[in-house]
């Protein structure tokens, strides 16, 4: 046995004391009282904030504190609660729910918390973490909407124009082409994004809430095939994801859009659809034992959507002049727009595009009900050339619908009425458009000019679509300078009008021959 001299003992003790360091980890923890249906009741966590992220070390899951009560905290779980047990530990993170934002997300598919789910590995590039649920900009940092956001769809750009920074509701029954309008709008931004100018580009964010995974996969494939995925982000909280993820996904995606808005860029966010977010929120609220209101929705379901949609804005020049445009979708039951959630969202947004089942089945696609659709921004969101041709269309279509209803009962019609009916039928045909074939604004102007100035009056109704196709092909070969002039001058000048009239006259003879 080694002998230690008394003189050395004090040295050894000093060395031991000098190296003695026990790491202490101080964390506020709580205990699960009960868990089930994606909700955990937690005892403890006295200082937790509302909306704070909490961790369940035992199962590796995370959750968000929503109900702060006297003796416990109601936590919604962002995952499967199967591995959680009564008595398990819960710890605070001290941070409110944050999501990654920035250009690194472009071209990626992420979940409601911003984690990539497309199998392409982690996010690469500059990522900025932002709070998912933030206050909307006030009154002074905003300016009125005055810059067009081209959807590439004639019926919308001409009749219910949407501006950058606007909130336009897409509302209709299931299977009426709501998602098709959203995809077309995203695809239509390809030409403006190809310019590579951040002040003009429009980055797109598609939020899938409560949809089938196969539907989301098909949508991503469509965006990839059309080359639109490179300037888009897809945020997916599918039907198999827990209700808290479906509730959070729109806010997380909105934070991603706000990154572009607040850095002087432009973004478009589409929520498909907010009816399912309201259902997920209702489920969470009822399980948290919050008092139910109309249709069993909680009392703050209006605030759920208003605080989300108010974050879409056109910022003033002092704040970078960026914008975030929102296209929320609401699914109606049997065309009932007077139900609770539809009326809420209609009152929050700056107008709505109303899609009708009857029109869809009659082959009028996009099935836009022109009478029921409105844009509260109006012609401020159109270039002058579009105003010049679109002004008459709405009136002519309204008169046509009225005449068509009366003409069913009348046997002999005067020539003026017959002419109006003929023109209206051709305009309805002209506003039809196949999926994923958006038109540039100058192409739309030329087509609508032909419709409103009587150049298609002699064309048989069933030949209108082929007339349009051939006209566009002809314009791209023999009328390039007309298109270029409308694109750069953004109006139909006297000189342009003469050239376009001559072009359409000669094309009409060629088409008839």
Swiss-Prot record:
Residues binding ATP, per UniProt: 172-179
A single GO molecular function term of this UniProt record: ATP binding
Membrane topology field: Peripheral membrane protein
Site, as annotated: Required for activity: 373
This protein's UniProt keywords: ATP synthesis, ATP-binding, Cell inner membrane, Cell membrane, CF(1), Hydrogen ion transport, Ion transport, Membrane, Nucleotide-binding, Translocase, Transport
Family matches, as PROSITE patterns: ATPASE_ALPHA_BETA
Species assigned in the record: Gluconacetobacter diazotrophicus (strain ATCC 49037 / DSM 5601 / CCUG 37298 / CIP 103539 / LMG 7603 / PAl5)
Function: Produces ATP from ADP in the presence of a proton gradient across the membrane. The alpha chain is a regulatory subunit.
Quaternary state and interactors: F-type ATPases have 2 components, CF(1) - the catalytic core - and CF(0) - the membrane proton channel. CF(1) has five subunits: alpha(3), beta(3), gamma(1), delta(1), epsilon(1). CF(0) has three main subunits: a(1), b(2) and c(9-12). The alpha and beta chains form an alternating ring which encloses part of the gamma chain. CF(1) is attached to CF(0) by a central stalk formed by the gamma and epsilon chains, while a peripheral stalk is formed by the delta and b chains.
NCBIfam families: atpA (TIGR00962), PRK13343.1 (NF009884)
Name listed for the protein in its UniProt record: ATP synthase subunit alpha
UniProt family annotation: Belongs to the ATPase alpha/beta chains family.
Coiled coil: none
GO cellular component terms listed in the entry, alphabetical order: plasma membrane; proton-transporting ATP synthase complex
């Amino acid at each position: 046995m080694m002998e230690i001299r008394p003189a050395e003992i004090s040295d050894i003790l000093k060395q031991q004391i000098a190296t003695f360091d026990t790491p202490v980890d101080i964390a506020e923890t709580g205990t699960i009282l009960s868990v089930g249906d994606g909700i955990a009741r937690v005892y403890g966590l006295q200082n937790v904030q509302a909306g704070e992220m909490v961790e369940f070390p035992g199962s590796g899951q995370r959750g968000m504190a929503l109900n702060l009560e006297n003796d416990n905290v109601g936590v919604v779980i962002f995952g499967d609660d199967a591995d959680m047990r009564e008595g398990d530990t819960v710890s605070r993170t001290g941070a409110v729910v944050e999501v990654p934002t920035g250009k690194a997300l472009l071209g990626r598919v992420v979940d409601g918390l911003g984690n990539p789910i497309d199998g392409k590995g982690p996010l690469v590039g500059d990522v900025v973490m932002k709070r998912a649920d933030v206050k909307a900009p006030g009154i002074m940092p905003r300016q009125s909407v005055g810059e067009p956001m081209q959807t590439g769809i004639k019926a919308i750009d001409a009749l219910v124009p949407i501006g950058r920074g606007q909130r336009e509701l897409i509302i209709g029954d299931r299977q009426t082409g709501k998602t098709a309008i959203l995809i077309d709008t995203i695809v239509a931004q390809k030409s403006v994004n190809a310019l590579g100018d951040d002040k003009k580009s429009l980055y797109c964010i598609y939020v899938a809430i409560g949809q089938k995974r196969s539907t989301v996969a098909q949508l991503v494939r469509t965006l990839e095939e059309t080359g639109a995925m490179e300037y888009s982000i897809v945020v997916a909280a599918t039907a198999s994801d827990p209700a808290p993820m479906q509730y959070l996904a729109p806010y997380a995606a909105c934070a991603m859009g706000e990154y572009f808005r607040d850095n002087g860029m432009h973004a478009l966010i589409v929520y498909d659809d907010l009816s399912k977010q309201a259902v997920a929120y209702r489920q969470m609220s009822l399980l948290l034992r919050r008092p139910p209101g109309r249709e069993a929705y909680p009392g703050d379901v209006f605030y759920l959507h208003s605080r989300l949609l108010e974050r879409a804005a056109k910022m003033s020049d002092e704040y970078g002049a960026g914008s975030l445009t929102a296209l929320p979708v609401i699914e109606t039951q049997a065309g009932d727009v007077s139900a609770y959630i539809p009326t809420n969202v209609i009152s929050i947004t700056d107008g709505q595009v109303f899609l009708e089942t009857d029109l869809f089945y009659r082959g009028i696609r996009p099935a836009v009900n022109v009478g029921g659709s409105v844009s509260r921004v109006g012609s401020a969101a159109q270039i002058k050339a579009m105003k010049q041709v679109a002004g008459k269309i709405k009136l002519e279509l309204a008169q046509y619908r009225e005449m068509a209803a009366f003409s069913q009962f009348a046997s002999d019609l005067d020539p003026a009425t017959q002419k109006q009916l003929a023109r209206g039928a051709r305009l309805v045909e002209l506003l039809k458009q196949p999926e994923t074939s958006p038109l540039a604004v100058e192409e739309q102007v030329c087509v609508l000019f032909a419709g409103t100035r009587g150049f298609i009056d002699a064309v048989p109704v069933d030949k209108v679509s082929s007339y349009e196709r051939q006209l566009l092909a002809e314009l791209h070969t023999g009328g390039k300078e007309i298109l270029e002039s409308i694109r750069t001058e953004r109006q139909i000048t006297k000189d342009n009008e003469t050239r376009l009239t001559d072009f359409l006259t000669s094309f009409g003879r060629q088409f008839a021959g």
